[in-house]
Amino acid sequence: MPTVHNSEYIKELLVDNTSYKIYDINKAASDIGISLNKLPYSLRVLLENVLRTSGNKENLLVFKEWLKTKKSNTEIDFMPARVLMQDFTGVPAIVDLAAMRDAMQKIGCNPLKINPLIPVDLVIDHSVSVDSYGLKESFEQNVQMEMKRNIERYQFLKWGQQAFNNFKVVPPGTGICHQVNLEYLSKVVWYNDGTAYPDSLVGTDSHTTMVNGLSVLGWGVGGIEAEAAMLGQPLTMIIPEVIGVKLTGKLEGMATATDLVLTITEMLRRTKVVGKFVEFFGYGLSNLTISDRATISNMSPEYGATCGFFPIDQETIKYLEITGRETRQIKLVEKYATEQNLWYNFEDTQEYTEVLELDLSTVYSSLAGPKRPQDRVNLSFVESNFKNELPYFALENQDIDKKYAVANQNYEIGNGDVVIAAITSCTNTSNPSVMIGAALLAKKALEHGLNVKPWVKTSLAPGSKVVTEYLKISGLDKYLDALGFNLVGYGCTTCIGNSGSLNPEIENTINKNRLVVASVLSGNRNFEGRINPLTKASYLASPILVVAYALSGTLNIDLTTTPIGANIYLKDIWPSQKEIDAVIANSINPSMFIEKYADVFNGTKEWHDLHITTGTNYNWDKNSTYINNPPYFDNICSENTIKDIKSAKILAIFGDSITTDHISPAGSISKNSPAAKYLIEHNIEPLNFNSYGSRRGNHEVMMRGTFANIRIKNEMCNGVEGGFTINQLSGVQQTIYDAAMDYQAHDIPLVVFAGKEYGSGSSRDWAAKGPGLLGIKAIIAESFERIHRSNLVGMGILPLTFTGNNTRLSLKLDGSETIDIIGLSKNIRPFNLVKCVIKKQTNEISTIDLILQIFTENEINYIKHGSIMQFVVESLKG
């Protein structure tokens, strides 16, 4: 039985003759001398969590402190109700748990102590690629290819399901984890052992935040933090600043929820909300469905916030009803939220660190690109935006308007042509309004004699089977099929870079003529090199605009003033909101959700037929190139101290906005990369390389793939793209991996310098694990993104920031310097100042201050133990 804390706050909640115990946050707030109505709704959820899980009532006083200054420097322990994972991040997490069991056995402890104590759901959604498209058979063909490529990984996950308690796997071909979470897994109010409490979670994908649109507090963490949470370790955090966004008015004209989230992303990136909660309030909430809100919450990582929270209201109840949740559960949510002052009240006087305001009627039809999700562009300016960005792509001495013939085809392509148009990602496919809007636009386009341009690769990959069901019931699926937007899979596909190959003749034309072609997708990220290696420009857009750009085939058009064809303008085929709402009313009902999720954990015959080994500990195959026992626990009993870094060399110097995609790419493995060399040495043909993301269970592949993004630029190698550096031992340009191994052989520690927003993007912990295995001891940057900073600490790597006006540029670093970081071996505390001594080859020495970006005492312990994983094993072995 779990330990009961603060029992004097337990009271009974009666819902239809069922009695639940709840922790009364109204009484708790009164006892510490605050008005609960002044606390943001997201912090009320945190207050309940601390009240229910903390043994020290004094911990509640931090909320009183927060109300005084609207910020806090005091840490709390957060205990999520559950954990959500996807397979790219989930496989390495289960590998780590399996390795922990071996480590426990090695030191004479019970390996079964390594077991999730809270529910863990893993949804396999990241592995399907768009190999086949434009055919009615595409879905089946892609599923077969997925199973063939990933059989070893899936066998491992099935082993994990039988080996670990509280661990369930949603098989491939079912949906995207965040949409499955929204439509099925989330309860809004959880109950266990007779106690009801707010649903909450952390997930190993940064877009876990999507569920905040359903009033479930949650955010993305690295796999190593998620592992700790599974094993009962609290997630230590400082109560964040909360930015209130007051919404007024309603969307008008052609504006969609996608346009709204791109507008919010642009606005909040400028406001700088990294590490902060964002909470939406105001009368505008009544004009946003849960699907609209989920779209906004999904892109929290893109605007930098820990989460984008919407409080419970009548829309929450309507969504639970339409998605087929049990009546008992819905009544519990309504009664609990009302009793605990978690139900949104327009008259509440909640206070925020800062308040921003957005009138929904000012939102215009938009895209974002060509390489960052915060770079919103009005639809009417996309053509000029793309042309203005062309110089960035280094098109010197080229006729940018020239068209080039495609072999064996009767068309030409040029710069700005759209070669990928993908309706993809849970960000938008979870929203019936934009999905039905896209289908209606397809219908009208066909009725006006329009068609998709032949050079455009089209695909439809929704986040759940419910989407294809309502498209089928509405009769609109046939119009999308007719334009080539056939179902290719239920998974992330193009949004995460699994866009598949283009037509070989098109690829040859692009490469031969160095064309800057584009992808337009309904996803949430468009970082360089992410969507497809050949689409240097990528624009995020609503599914409706994805179809529109597939029809135009180019960015070199103003769709607001120029006809798409034969005097047909976009406005002529754009569906009205009234048309969309009518289809929704006639095509979506609770029974389809109940039916499609009835067998969500069952899977296909191919899944059932997977042969697996059983047992407590995993039987590692030393020859496997997918699953390998990692070396994190080789020195499990080593001395737990922090030492100064002496005589370190600089492995790389990076600019601003280095993403986790740059650090640890998820996409295809280049044939000339260190990872490819390793795979070839292990008799893997290039055709079977699969992706970096699929091989995250093998540290040998992943450390070789660290900083291997084809678009990354190390400032030590002027003008060179890709994962290269100058090895200071030889003076030779090498791959970053090869240079790092040379430094390791000489026992030389490494550091990396960078600019602003280092580690933005996905939550992938391999962006910290990889650098750790390369021997990097510290990253020195102007600023870090939230999740990546936590991941670095979790792997024992020091995140350090400059003080004053110092930057890598002001210091005039060229990479030949030797670095000492002094002051670590003393009694270090969070946010300590440490000294960085920079020794140039000219013997010139300078010393600067750096700020240790370690937030809590727990994080100090992770650094001392070498990683959060070693800390957990040490904690459990007693």
Curated annotation (Swiss-Prot):
PROSITE patterns: ACONITASE_1 (PS00450), ACONITASE_2 (PS01244). It catalyses: citrate = D-threo-isocitrate; (2S,3R)-3-hydroxybutane-1,2,3-tricarboxylate = 2-methyl-cis-aconitate + H2O. [4Fe-4S] cluster binds at C426, C492, C495. The keyword Iron-sulfur applies. Binds 1 [4Fe-4S] cluster per subunit. Keywords: 4Fe-4S, Iron, Iron-sulfur, Lyase, Metal-binding, RNA-binding, Tricarboxylic acid cycle. GO terms for biological process: propionate metabolic process, methylcitrate cycle; tricarboxylic acid cycle. InterPro entries: AcnA_IRP_Swivel, Acnase/IPM_dHydase_lsu_aba_1/3, Acoase/IPM_deHydtase_lsu_aba, Aconitase/3IPM_dehydase_swvl, Aconitase/IRP2, Aconitase_4Fe-4S_BS, Aconitase_4Fe-4S_dom, AconitaseA/IPMdHydase_ssu_swvl. Pathway: Carbohydrate metabolism; tricarboxylic acid cycle; isocitrate from oxaloacetate: step 2/2; Organic acid metabolism; propanoate degradation. It is an enzyme of class 4 (lyase). It comes from the Bacteria. SUPFAM superfamilies: Aconitase iron-sulfur domain, LeuD/IlvD-like. Pfam families: Aconitase, Aconitase_C. Its EC number is 4.2.1.3, 4.2.1.99. CDD domains: AcnA_IRP, AcnA_IRP_Swivel. The keyword Iron-sulfur applies. One of its GO terms (molecular function) is aconitate hydratase activity. Its cofactor is [4Fe-4S] cluster. Monomer. Belongs to the aconitase/IPM isomerase family. Involved in the catabolism of short chain fatty acids (SCFA) via the tricarboxylic acid (TCA)(acetyl degradation route) and probably the 2-methylcitrate cycle I (propionate degradation route). Catalyzes the reversible isomerization of citrate to isocitrate via cis-aconitate. Could catalyze the hydration of 2-methyl-cis-aconitate to yield (2R,3S)-2-methylisocitrate. The apo form of AcnA functions as a RNA-binding regulatory protein. This is Aconitate hydratase A. It comes from Rickettsia typhi (strain ATCC VR-144 / Wilmington). The gene is acnA.
